[in-house]
Amino acid sequence: MDTAAQKTLVPGDVHAGGEAGRSARPAPSLSDSFRSTRALSLALAERLSDADATIQSMEDASPAKWHLAHTSWFFETFLLRDHLPGYRLFDDRFPFLFNSYYEAEGQRIARFSRGMLSRPALDECIAFRRAVDDAMEPLLGREDCAPLIALGIAHEQQHQELLLTDIKHALFQNPLGPAMFDRLPDTPQHKGEGWIEHQGGIARIGQDCADTRFCFDCEGPRHRVLLEPFRLSRSLVSNREWAEFIADGGYRNPALWLSDGWAWVNREGIEAPLYWHGDQHFTLAGWQDRDPDAPATHISYYEADAFASWAGKRLPTEAEWEVAAADADPAGGQQMDRAEAVQPAATPDLFGSCWQWTRSAYLPYPGFSPAEGAVGEYNGKFMSGQFVLKGASCATARGHSRPSYRNFFYPHQRWQFTGLRLAQDI
């Protein structure tokens, strides 16, 4: 094991406001958050060969070295280029290669072609990162740059999770079953019991970003919602429960499925969660025996909805989930804060094991308006056809565990650490 990868590298809490503020751990400075976040990305990459870091298993995923370079492009484009006098781009060709989806920043390579980039090599992408890190130093203490730096840190932390889930999917394609990590962490299972009950009424959800250290624009504005009485399970659906769903013909019963979901199951030949094979599943440490008490993960919205129907329950709305989590401590769950393997565990915590599907479409809150300029493309333009997930996963950075956080994916996607928690009316 690379000794550099064994160091404890804690990414900065770019958001510790709201309910997350209950944690007694002091928030690091913005400059410390920047440096530790950038170091963690490199520590993850040190476990990969150049070939590992270049492959792309599907259009939804990206090569590891692309993540490393894209996050550097973000700082170069939105901070160094516009705020550091005399700054020259590291390479004039890189914006075309490493822009993701920002139309205002010009043309870019097609997403499905990212895995064709044999050049620049991994070491060149790392050299790009180090040059950007050095150039950023004069900006780290500037108050006028602080909001964009915080956004860049949060953006990179999101890509750290994507790097892990993308490389997991890529290694899964290899018949040799290669592992990124030597072993999985010890994750004792402490499953919650019973239900969190709420009597309904008027509640407030969302976040006013001006009132906290950082949040994404899609988390606000804070607004009122009307809730009917409901209960939310204290436990995530487990592998054992999912195996019962399979044994009972859950993947063969069209009455349980949404029409689009049933078409997807038949078109793709879906018979189990992604990475399942017999009693084993593929992990970042290769093939392992599946823990029946661990949460069922790598499931799509379609699968989550079908399971809820089979169980005689339903998925929660994002408002229900957020209100139920109002008194939870986001620091209580698992956190991805070092370059070590991650694996979901059953915990009584709402946060930090797997992202949990809700039945809520990812749509703008009342009064939402995206930021001006290219950074306004970060969230708002994706508010179509996707569903909200709550709770953070074992691969999510520490500072992203908060009730107002809105993750989102298309209903067929399942390569992330996604699971479910049941709800019902009362």
Can you describe what each PLM-predicted range is?
Residues 133, 137, 195, 202-204, ...:
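A general secondary-structure boundary signal
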Residues 2-62, 66-135, 146-150, 154-171, ...:
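Disulfide-stabilized, aromatic/cysteine-rich ligand-recognition loop
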Residues 152, 156-158, 162, 166, ...:
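Functional-site microenvironments in short loops/helix caps that host divalent-cation chemistry
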